[in-house]
Amino acid sequence: MNATEAPRPPLPPFDAEAAARKVRMAEDAWNSRDPQRVSLAYTPDSTWRNRAEFVSGRAEIVAFLRRKWARELDYRLIKELWAFHGNRIAVRFAYEWRDDSGQWYRSYGNENWEFDERGFMQRRKIGRAHV
């Protein structure tokens, strides 16, 4: 993040309304399936644990999302606020997608988010199951 990058409200500490708004903003960005747009919500050195995969920094986030959406076609996501405290938010999610053979899948899971003081996500941990 450079000095000219504006904060991303709402900023922590979160109340219920701000946490719900942050979740909706993330849902909208992910449903755009635009890796660059999604990556801008994270700090330049953001770290992710996505099941067994570890991602660090915006460039790796963009690469991860490109790979993900190349195989998860017609991706559609719903995120729901689960809990929040201070600069942390927990989310439940469900999404549907199909592979290139036309087989549809549904994935469920939870995410734990930690934000910096400027409203950028600095840490994201996810657990997910496919059905």
Descriptions of predicted regions:
Residues 17-21, 35-88:
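A solvent-exposed, acidic/Ser-Thr-rich amphipathic alpha-helical stretch
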